[in-house]
């Protein structure tokens, strides 16, 4: 009888959590409003500094990691919202996770930096700072290191407990048209201007050949024959073909800088390259052929300060997409796995406050 009573209580608690989260998901504006700058000022005053230190240490060894962390935040937010779901290595419901899906694997990077930051934060303030917030802080710090752009990050996100590879269809592929880009961003409550502004992140980082291969090779022939996408400069296409020969496959580990001029500097060079036919992706070229987008490209190409101001604002706006706050979600103890049920069922504990002391080291499951 006692066993049945315990089971009933457990089911009731689980249903309460599900109901609470369902209610939060129905009230996205309310959740966004709960994010605030300085969220950890009392509960973990050094949280942002610890994340900054982890990012700076990684950047000192590899400047390219900054682009990876910026992209990590984007890919997190566009699938299920900014909830750290892209970090999960195991899907509690079974099946492949976002992290393993083709848009993310093998190109997405920065997971080790997030883990290092989480370890440092947990040592200082156990069970307090979410992985989703760490991702947002790390992206901001990466932008600061590469572009001397600083902005404050509203925090208070909770970590999600679901990660499905199939949902990565929400990520805009490099083959996107102007209309599909507009639609994908609109679905996340981001405007055409936000989309053009955020596309400027392509001024840092690298890409695998597979993302642009069909712009320079005709794959309908065997062997593939050279072509030049109308949106590409012939000389740039020739350079890309030399880098990625016709026998390149989806898994060939060859990459090229998305901005060949200043690949590790967050500047407005991306917008200057587009009119010259040097946008690496088909989707990049779409920004210069669509009149509304082309006007924005021209504006940002001539005014880097304007673009950086708008980029910072757009990053903050993106960081509010479908967030979980309050008692929804959880404060994940290990960014790669969801918490044990003992801890996660304690939904009354709000992020930023002290968690129950009942959970010990078992919360740090191996990822």
UniProtKB/Swiss-Prot annotation:
Glycosylated residue positions: 164, 218, 247, 303
Under PANTHER family, the record lists: PEROXIDASE (PTHR31517:SF84), PTHR31517
Top EC class of this enzyme: oxidoreductase
Extract the InterPro entries matched here. Answer: Haem_peroxidase, Haem_peroxidase_sf, Peroxidase_pln, Peroxidases_AS, Peroxidases_heam-ligand_BS, Secretory_peroxidase
Tissue occurrence: Expressed in the root tip meristems.
Q: What is its EC number?
A: 1.11.1.7
Q: Which domain of life is it from?
A: Eukaryota
Q: Which cofactor does it need?
A: heme b; Ca(2+)
- Organism source for this protein? Zea mays
Give one GO term, molecular function aspect: peroxidase activity
The residues that hold substrate are 172
Where Ca(2+) 1 is bound, by residue?
76, 79, 81, 83, 85
Which GO BP terms sit in this record?
A: hydrogen peroxide catabolic process; response to oxidative stress; response to stress
Q: What is this protein called in UniProt? A: Peroxidase 1
Can you say where in the cell this protein is located?
Secreted; Vacuole
Signal peptide boundaries? 1-33
Give the cofactor note text.
Answer: Binds 1 heme b (iron(II)-protoporphyrin IX) group per subunit. Binds 2 calcium ions per subunit.
Active-site residues per Swiss-Prot or TrEMBL entry: 75
Amino acids binding Ca(2+) 2: 203, 259, 262, 267
Mind listing the UniProt keywords for this protein, alphabetically? Calcium, Disulfide bond, Glycoprotein, Heme, Hydrogen peroxide, Iron, Metal-binding, Oxidoreductase, Peroxidase, Pyrrolidone carboxylic acid, Secreted, Signal, Vacuole
Primary localisation category: secreted
């Amino acid at each position: 009888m006692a066993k049945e009573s315990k089971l009933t209580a457990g089911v009731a608690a689980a249903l309460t959590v599900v109901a609470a989260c369902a209610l939060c998901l129905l009230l996205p504006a309310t959740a966004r409003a709960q994010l605030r700058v300085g969220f950890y000022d009392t509960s973990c005053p050094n949280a942002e500094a610890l994340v900054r230190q982890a990012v700076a240490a990684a950047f000192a060894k590899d400047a390219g990691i900054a682009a990876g962390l910026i992209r990590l935040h984007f890919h997190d937010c566009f699938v299920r919202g900014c909830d750290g779901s892209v970090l999960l290595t195991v899907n509690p419901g079974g099946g492949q996770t976002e992290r393993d899906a083709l848009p993310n694997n093998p190109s997405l990077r920065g997971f080790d930096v997030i883990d290092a930051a989480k370890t440092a934060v947990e040592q200082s303030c156990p069970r307090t700072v979410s992985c989703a917030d760490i991702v947002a802080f790390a992206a901001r710090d990466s932008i600061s290191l590469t572009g001397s752009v600083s902005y404050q990050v509203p925090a208070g996100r909770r970590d999600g407990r679901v990660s499905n590879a199939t949902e990565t269809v929400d990520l805009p592929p490099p083959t996107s048209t102007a209309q599909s880009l507009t639609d994908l961003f609109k679905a996340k409550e981001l405007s055409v201007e936000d989309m053009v502004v955020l596309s400027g992140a392509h001024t840092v980082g690298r890409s695998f050949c597979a993302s642009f291969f069909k712009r320079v090779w005709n794959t309908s022939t065997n062997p593939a024959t050279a072509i030049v996408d109308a949106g590409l400069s012939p000389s740039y296409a020739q350079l890309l073909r030399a880098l990625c020969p016709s026998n390149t496959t989806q898994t060939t580990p060859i990459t090229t800088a998305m901005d060949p001029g200043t690949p590790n500097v967050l500047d407005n060079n991306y917008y200057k390259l587009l009119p010259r036919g040097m946008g690496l992706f088909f989707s990049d070229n779409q920004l210069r052929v669509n009149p509304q987008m082309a006007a924005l490209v021209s504006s940002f190409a001539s005014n880097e300060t304007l673009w950086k101001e708008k980029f910072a604002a757009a990053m903050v706006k993106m960081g509010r997409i479908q967030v979980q706050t309050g008692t929804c979600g959880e404060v994940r103890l290990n960014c790669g796995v969801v918490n044990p049920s003992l801890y996660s069922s304690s939904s009354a504990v709000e992020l930023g406050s002290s968690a129950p002391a009942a959970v010990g080291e078992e919360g740090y499951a191996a990822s």
